[in-house]
Amino acid sequence: MSEIKLIVGLANPGAEYAQTRHNAGAWYVQELARICGVTLVPDSKYFGLTARAVLQGKDVRLLIPTTYMNLSGKAVGALANFFRITPEEILVAHDELDMPPGVAKFKLGGGHGGHNGLKDIIAKLANDKNFYRLRIGIGHPGDKNQVSGYVLGKAPAKEQELIEAAIDEAVRSTEILYKENMVKAMTRLHSFKAE
């Protein structure tokens, strides 16, 4: 397995979106930055907030695109190209409708599942889908016509607690990823479910 050199948290920019379910990926990167003691700062060259962090002695770039979600690939592509980071060395954290709040899972490759952020990243990586994802469960509204309003809405307090618990566990599992390997990180994270 390639070493992860870039961790991306997907989000929409602006205060009005900061607490919406669609920004769960960014919450994870913000928490990673906090435990690494680094500050995410705006960098127009990479169309996002970036930081250089050290996890278990290894250098990693953190990125939260400040483009809108459907243009996330612009930021990921710019940073990956500049630092010559391959898709296999990228981990993208995003909200996942098909998993309940309180659950998060790592995954390598796959489609975009209708997620506009993933869709644009795949396009900007020359259709290479072979990057890692951290899927953060937010649940599903039950009707596909309600998805847009749902992901752009705030989770009720109990659901928010579950999402945050899964993110905390994902951060701990990310430390295991750097200390040991992805298999051990997956084993830990995939057995977790916040209640």
Swiss-Prot record:
Site (Stabilizes the basic form of H active site to accept a proton) location in chain: 95
On whether Hydrolase is a keyword of this UniProt record, the answer is: yes
Supply the InterPro entries for this chain: Pept_tRNA_hydro, Pept_tRNA_hydro_CS, Pept_tRNA_hydro_sf
Indicate the enzyme's highest-level EC class.
hydrolase
GO biological process terms, semicolon-separated: protein quality control for misfolded or incompletely synthesized proteins; rescue of stalled ribosome
Quick one: where is this thing mainly located? cytoplasm
Q: Which keywords, in A-to-Z order, does the entry hold? A: Cytoplasm, Hydrolase, RNA-binding, tRNA-binding
Kindly state which reaction or reactions the protein catalyses: an N-acyl-L-alpha-aminoacyl-tRNA + H2O = an N-acyl-L-amino acid + a tRNA + H(+)
* GO molecular function annotations of the record: peptidyl-tRNA hydrolase activity; tRNA binding
In the UniProt entry, which residues are flagged as the active site? 22 (proton acceptor)
Quote the EC number. 3.1.1.29
List site positions: Discriminates between blocked and unblocked aminoacyl-tRNA: 12
Where does the UniProt annotation locate this protein? Cytoplasm
Instruction: Enumerate the Pfam families for this protein.
Output: Pept_tRNA_hydro (PF01195)
Tell me how this protein assembles: Monomer.
Q: Which family does it belong to?
A: Belongs to the PTH family.
Q: What does this protein do?
A: Hydrolyzes ribosome-free peptidyl-tRNAs (with 1 or more amino acids incorporated), which drop off the ribosome during protein synthesis, or as a result of ribosome stalling.
Output this protein's name.
Peptidyl-tRNA hydrolase
Which organism does this sequence originate in?
Shewanella putrefaciens (strain CN-32 / ATCC BAA-453)
